[in-house]
Regions:
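Adenosine-phosphate binding glycine-rich loop
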Residues: 2-25, 221-222, 336-448
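Conserved active-site and cofactor/substrate-binding residues in soluble primary-metabolism enzymes
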Residues: 3, 7, 17-24, 28, ...
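Flexible, glycine/charged-enriched surface loops at secondary-structure junctions
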Residues: 20-23, 39-46, 119, 156-165, ...
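Structured beta-strand/loop patches that form or line metal/cofactor-binding pockets in enzymes
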Residues: 42-73
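Glycine/serine-rich phosphate-binding loop and adjoining beta1-alpha1 elements at the start
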Residues: 96, 115-230
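Glycine-rich phosphate/diphosphate-binding loop of Rossmann-like nucleotide-binding domains
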Residues: 202-314
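Rossmann-like adenosine-cofactor binding region
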Residues: 265-366, 371
Length: 448
């Protein structure tokens, strides 16, 4: 391994020994860049990697709010502005109990390369809070969002930092956040947030975009082997917007998603989540705030497996859509035992490094999350363009641009890996392609 890369990784571990998620993503990315770094000695001379792994800014703040019982609650808010070399910081807001600085830094670091892959002018950032919206009333969520934005507004803007949604933050939350921002700054800057409702500057197919993009990317992977999505069975985890988009686009292309999962277990639907009724019901489940996938089994009369994960099901493609590190060695072995051929990461870093390299070593085609799930931020970027132009594009136009972006991300990843002598390696290829654009911009802007 390259001595410079190892030194940078060790420095990260020394500085932030408790930030396991951040260390994991730094190791995975940097170790795939060995050949590129060897070809560019100027990177070490200018401490490029040291600058790359250090966020430009980390903001942490308290978020006090009042629940329906009149009790004052206090949560932590975060915004990690990781890298602005190629554009304003861009990345989602996550509201979940597991949110901490390590999770925010890992997501912001990944976002930097993901945004680079889209070829749109967006830097990398991420934010959120350890506030858990599950079981909260609409009024409580509104009050929390207003308090959160009362601090966040100081650090964002259409040309500075443009947040969006993520886990626990959907269209409702974005609306509350935008309303409070508008009230505080006394200006209608609808480019400050993406993922908005259509009525105040949102883009068509933004809620579905991550799932749509994942299927478009998977199409390219299958095409490489002379196959199509037609007739393929897919195991999916989660049942939120990402899984919903995957189900919709997979059904349109003749494939079928046969599993969904939640904290309570998973469902197996052999007929597939393919009808409009089933796909629409996923949104009802999510908006209920109950966080139970068993409701789907009860409604449609399919099997429910409590407290289990769906990776033991025999399918053609596995697409984890839930949360980081949901796939460890146990789950990877289950997939392998069932003859899995394609493993398409959709959630952010859903696989431990050990499981990731295990699957790759066993000949499974692995597509990395930073490339696969770039559809969401791509359409966010297109929403920013529409806001700047004060226009609203048609669904067909947005979908066509999304499809083109995902095709280009796949092609760039393949080309980058091949140029580095790594063969057909989508994981390394995505890291290299995303890194090179950011590195070139950082080198051109001096030591900042």
């Amino acid at each position: 391994m390259n001595a410079y890369i190892e030194r940078v990784i060790e420095d990260v571990k020394r500085r932030d020994p408790d930030q396991k998620e951040f260390i994991q993503t730094v190791e995975e990315v940097l170790r795939s860049l060995e050949k590129v770094v060897e070809q560019h000695p100027e990177y070490e001379k200018t401490a490029l990697l040291e600058r790359l792994v250090e966020p430009e800014r980390v903001v942490q703040f308290r978020v006090p709010w009042v629940n329906d019982a009149g009790e004052v609650k206090v949560n932590r808010g975060f915004r990690v502005q990781f890298n602005s070399a190629i554009g304003p910081y861009k990345g989602g807001l996550r509201f979940a109990s597991h949110v901490n600085q390590s999770v925010m830094k890992f997501l912001g670091f990944e976002q930097t390369f993901k945004n680079s892959l889209t070829s749109l002018p967006m830097g990398g950032g991420k934010g959120g809070s350890d506030f858990d919206p599950t079981g909260k009333s609409d009024a409580e969520i509104m009050r929390f969002c207003q308090s959160f934005m009362t601090e966040l507004y100081r650090h964002i803007g259409p040309n500075v930092d443009v947040p969006a949604g993520d886990l626990g933050v959907g269209g409702r939350e974005i609306g509350y956040l935008f309303g409070q921002y508008k009230r505080i700054v006394n200006a209608y800057e609808n480019g400050v947030l993406t993922g908005k409702a259509r009525s105040f500057g949102g883009s068509v197919i933004r809620p579905e975009a991550t799932g749509y993009g994942a299927i478009y990317y998977a199409e390219n992977v299958l095409k490489h082997d002379g196959e199509t999505m037609e007739g393929k069975t897919i195991a999916v985890s989660g049942f939120g917007n990402v899984a919903w988009g995957v189900c919709k686009k997979a059904a349109q292309l003749g494939a079928k998603v046969v599993t969904l999962s939640g904290p309570d277990g998973f469902i197996y639907d052999p007929d597939g989540v393919i009808t409009e009724e089933k796909i629409s019901y996923m949104l009802e489940m999510r908006s209920s705030n109950r966080n139970r996938v068993q409701d789907y089994a009860d409604k449609f009369g399919v099997e429910f497996f409590p407290k289990q994960k769906p990776w033991g099901c025999k399918v053609d493609i596995c697409m984890p859509c839930a949360y980081q590190n949901e796939i460890g060695m146990k789950e990877a072995q289950q997939m392998l035992d069932n003859g899995i051929k394609y493993y398409i990461e959709v959630a952010n870093m859903p696989t431990t490094n050990e499981a990731l390299f295990f699957l790759m070593g066993k000949g499974v085609t692995v597509a990395p999350s930073k490339a696969v799930n770039a559809g969401g931020v791509s359409v966010s970027g297109l929403e920013m363009s529409q806001n700047s132009e004060r226009l609203s594009w048609k669904a067909e136009e947005v979908d066509a641009q999304l499809h083109n972006i995902m095709d280009n991300i796949y092609a760039a990843s393949v080309e980058a890996a091949e140029k580095s002598g790594l063969g057909y390696n989508l994981v390394a290829g995505a890291n290299i392609a995303g890194f090179l654009k950011v590195a070139d911009a950082m080198m051109g802007q001096g030591i900042v």
